[in-house]
Regions:
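Active-site acidic/histidine proton-transfer and metal-coordination neighborhood
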Residues: 3-7, 18, 98-200, 276
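Aromatic side chains
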Residues: 31, 56, 92, 169-174, ...
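Non-transmembrane, interaction-prone segments in cytosolic or luminal domains
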Residues: 69-70, 74-76, 81, 134, ...
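N-terminal pre-domain/capping segments
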Residues: 2-129, 133, 163, 284, ...
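Histidine-acidic metal/acid-base catalytic patches
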Residues: 4-11, 15-27, 35-52, 131, ...
């Protein structure tokens, strides 16, 4: 584990004169296989074994139909992952809740999902119980400048609490973080109004590309702030997520310049994957074209 705030990943540095791996292990955001893990009666352990069998080494989790950690307690889920040869790096959780739209049927009485603003201590405690090294915000309300500012305030608290528990905090982007709102973007506001040693980004390479951003230019603008990546591709025609290497994201350009980003963990993600063959083909493409 790197010291808090370090921008040089441990996989870059050779130890005992040996040659260090060129890139981090291939990981998976298991949201990709939510249709399996969230199915009624899903055999979590068996599905994790299938994930390991396609060459995945590290995983992230996300809330789904079976609840947090796919119906398991954090420690139990962590043991399942470890037993199948997987390392559980972090879990996605929402940030600042969006204000529900007014409607004839009030949503005020409905229980609100756990989120960083309201449940940060519980979320960090769960991550610690599972042995995770990262607390990750999956998305947050950022449609107004006020929401952007309040989101940044929540992230400051999350970064502080994660550090106190020997973990780190990161924010996962979509396209909307790059929209101009009153002359600023949520992406720039968060990165320039939080401590670079406590608040990091999990850069979704596909959504950044879809927003017209060059990930390498972002690395240069904010060096060391991107220790986590979502390795996602987008179909050249439809713009929808597709297996890595079959779409329009320039992964060779991005990986070649990865050192500047401070990347430590990379997670394949494919929204709408139809079966485990989709991430399996992404793993194979990366091994053949990037990790060779």
């Amino acid at each position: 584990m790197l010291a808090i705030g370090s921008s040089i990943p441990n996989w870059i540095v050779a130890r005992d004169s040996s040659i260090a791996p060129k890139y981090p292990p291939v990981g998976l955001q298991v949201y990709t296989l939510g249709f399996l893990l969230n199915a009624p009666g899903a055999d979590t352990r068996s599905i994790l074994k299938q994930i390991a069998d396609i060459g995945i080494k590290e995983i992230e989790t996300a809330t789904g139909g079976n609840g947090l950690y796919y119906g398991q307690k954090p420690k139990v889920f962590a043991e399942m992952a470890k037993d199948t040869g997987l390392k559980w790096i972090g879990n996605h959780i929402g940030g600042l809740p969006r204000t529900p739209a007014a409607s004839a049927t009030s949503t005020a009485a409905r229980p609100r999902s756990r989120n960083l603003r309201d449940n940060i201590q519980e979320i960090v405690d769960d991550a610690a119980e599972g042995g995770c090294s990262w607390v990750i915000c999956s998305s947050s309300a950022i449609s107004t400048l006020d929401e952007i500012k309040r989101t940044a305030e929540v992230f400051v608290k999350a970064g502080d609490l994660a550090e106190q528990n020997n973990m780190r905090f990161a924010y996962h982007n979509h396209q909307s973080e790059f929209d101009q709102i009153e002359g600023v973007t949520a992406f720039d506001y968060v990165l320039t109004n939080t401590d670079k040693k406590k608040v990091f980004m999990e850069l979704d390479l596909a959504w950044a590309t879809a927003a017209g951003q060059d990930p390498v230019a972002l690395f240069k603008k904010y060096p060391g702030r991107f220790p986590l990546w979502h390795v996602k591709d987008l179909d050249k025609t439809t713009g929808r997520p597709c297996p890595v290497g079959t779409g329009k994201v320039d992964f060779k350009h991005i990986f070649t310049n990865s050192k500047l980003s401070g990347v430590e963990h990379t997670f394949i993600e494919q929204d709408g994957a139809k079966n485990i063959d989709d991430p399996a083909s992404s793993v194979q493409w990366l091994k053949n074209n990037i990790y060779k």
